């Protein structure tokens, strides 16, 4: 495919893309940049970044920034919905995933451990929304929309991996979400990526907490 993902040696904002690519059997190159090199302006990466941040996606001479934009581009593998309504609903689902992710980021980057109980209460509310969504779609294949996995599923799966690492029992009251994580994690190509050395050696975030 000739895809290159430029990012720090973390899972972070690039991991949902890696889950998607790995599961779809698409090869890519991880171009890892150390944070101190990024800050020092190596290869003019920061200077040339449209909004001063990465991940950066490149295919030939085409360069793209912003994680959700890149994720939607990669959804061209038939992962955005089968009609206009499904496409719109998947966008809505992905926005909901981002709401969940931002609450997680707020806690992991800015809150202290004393606020963990409050965060877990808020997390349970957010998880409840997705449990209800899966309940409504339970007659299909245990994905968020319709009967086929979408980019929103990869983004949700990555976010769930993050919160499970923080609180391993956080899905105990959500049987469909627990099953969702287990089912998707057993998809052969995705499982292969999840067991890869690249995935294992990368911490979730760069702040030393995960």
Swiss-Prot record:
Residues annotated to bind glutathione: 7, 13, 38, 46, 53-54, 66-67
Keywords noted in UniProt: Transferase
Gene3D superfamilies for this protein: 1.20.1050.10, Glutaredoxin
Residue stretches making up the GST N-terminal domain: 1-82
Tissue: Liver, kidney, muscle, skin, lung and ovary.
Annotated TM spans: none
Pfam families from the UniProt entry: GST_C_3, GST_N
Record-annotated GST C-terminal domain positions: 83-204
Enzyme Commission (EC) number: 2.5.1.18
InterPro entries in the cross-refs: Glutathione-S-Trfase_C-like, Glutathione-S-Trfase_C_sf, Glutathione_S-Trfase_N, GST_C, GST_pi, GST_superfamily, Thioredoxin-like_sf
Superkingdom, taxonomy of origin: Eukaryota
Alphabetized GO MF terms: glutathione transferase activity
Annotated catalysed reactions: RX + glutathione = an S-substituted glutathione + a halide anion + H(+)
BP terms from Gene Ontology: glutathione metabolic process
GO CC terms in record: cytosol
Stated role: Conjugation of reduced glutathione to a wide number of exogenous and endogenous hydrophobic electrophiles.
Family per record: Belongs to the GST superfamily. Pi family.
Subunit and partners: Homodimer.
Name of this protein: Glutathione S-transferase P 2
């Amino acid at each position: 495919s000739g895809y290159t993902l430029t990012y720090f040696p973390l899972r972070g904002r690039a991991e949902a893309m890696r889950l998607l690519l790995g599961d779809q059997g698409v090869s890519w190159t991880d171009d890892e940049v150390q944070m101190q090199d990024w800050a020092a302006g190596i290869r003019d990466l920061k200077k040339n970044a449209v909004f001063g941040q990465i991940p950066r996606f490149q295919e030939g001479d085409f360069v793209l920034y912003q994680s959700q934009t890149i994720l939607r581009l990669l959804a061209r593998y038939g992962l955005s919905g089968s009609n206009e309504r499904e496409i719109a609903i998947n966008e809505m689902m992905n926005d909901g995933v981002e709401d969940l992710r931002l609450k997680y980021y707020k806690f992991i980057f800015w809150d202290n451990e004393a606020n963990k109980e409050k965060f877990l209460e808020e997390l349970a509310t957010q998880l409840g929304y997705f449990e209800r969504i899966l309940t409504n779609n339970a007659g299909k294949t245990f994905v968020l929309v319709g009967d086929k996995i979408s980019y929103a599923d990869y983004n949700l799966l990555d976010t769930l991996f993050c919160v499970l690492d923080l609180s391993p029992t956080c899905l105990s009251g959500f049987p469909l979400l627990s099953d969702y994580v287990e089912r998707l994690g057993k998809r052969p190509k995705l499982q292969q990526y999840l067991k890869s050395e690249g995935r294992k050696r990368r911490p979730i975030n760069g702040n030393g907490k995960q």
